[in-house]
Every structure is written in C-alpha cells, then in structure tokens.
Amino acid sequence: LLTLLLAGCGEGKDCKPNNFRKAAGAAARALHKAKAQKAVLAAPILLNAERSKNLQALVEGLYLGAYTFNRFKSEAKQAPLCEAAVLSAVPEAAAIITAAEISAEAVCYARDLVNNPGNVVTPQTMAEDALKLGQELPLEITIMDETLMEARGMHALLAVGQGSHNPPCLVALRYNGNGDAPYTAFVGKGITFDSGGISIKPDDNMGEMKDD
C-alpha cells in the first residue's frame, strides 16, 4: 500500500532552509502516524540559490520529525520511520546528506539526554557518555572530580553541586584537528538538574528542571 504525502514549503523564492526543515519534520510525523516505515522524498524545488542548505535542512527535518523516545514504555505503539530515500538533483547531495545525518543524530542524542529523568542522567552518567564519545571520535577527554576542582579553585561549581547527593564533575573535550587553525573554545552549561537558584521555579515548571 502506497501513500502520497504533500508538504508545503512556502512560495518559490521565499522558501528558506527552515521552511524545508519544518515541512520535512511535519511529513515525518505524518508518516509515523500513518505507520509508514519507509519513505521516498522527491524535492524538485530545491534548485534555487540555497539548494545545498535546503537539502541539508530537509534531511535534518526528516530525522528530527521521526524522533521518538520510548525508553520507558513497555511497548512502543508504533514503529518509527526507519528508512528514507531522497530524490535530489543537487550534485553534491551525498556529502550534504551525510552532514545532515551527523547534525540530526547529535540533536537526537541531546534530546535523549533531556528526555531522561534526573535520576538517570547524572553528572556521572554524562561523564561516562563523554568517555564513550572519546573512544569513538578523535577527542582528548579530561574529567575533573571534586578533588581536582577543589585544587583548581572551582568553588562556585562545587557550591552548586552541594545541592545534590550526586557529586559534580567537569568534562573537557579537546579536538586536535588542523594545528594551524585558530584555537576555538566552547563553554557549555551541562547542569543535569536545575532546581532553582535566585529565581525559584514554580510547580508548573518543575518538569523542565532536567532540561539544562
């Protein structure tokens, strides 16, 4: 049984990459609802000035729209969309699709971290996940425990960590790629459970405390 699904992306030249991302996401959710496990996407209107960006956004949207989190369900109600082919006239399509897959998989990984409850994702499990990434990717990983952070004078972080029975840690990832390239540093907040601070969260927002 074949199902034809049409997803609007806007009008012609006004279409931006995010239009394609949203349309593909909506299509993936509709296919999931229809219990489709395989799909073929035809995207003839990608051929404009931003065709490469549009194609990447389309694939990202398809991945993200098909995302489900069933870890704590005894039985998933529907099988997720697991295979899709994209028909495109963009010459560099293969490389673009690969980049989109990497980007979307990273987003889905972050979604998994957020969707897990605070008693599952702790500073220790975050550190363990970082170690796994270091084994799969060319990364140098340093994990600082309470003793090392105390020696480094990281008293603010340690003070915040005292609010939990799970001890804090700090993860540093280093990628040594092109040695001649400028040095770039990213600092990200990875609080696994944020119960307040100077702005106490009301009960309506308690479900978002694990989102940081």
Protein language model features and the residues they cover:
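Acidic/histidine-rich catalytic neighborhood of metal-dependent amide-processing enzymes
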Residues: I200-D212
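Short amphipathic alpha-helical segment within the helicase RecA-like ATPase core
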Residues: L1-G190, S195, E208
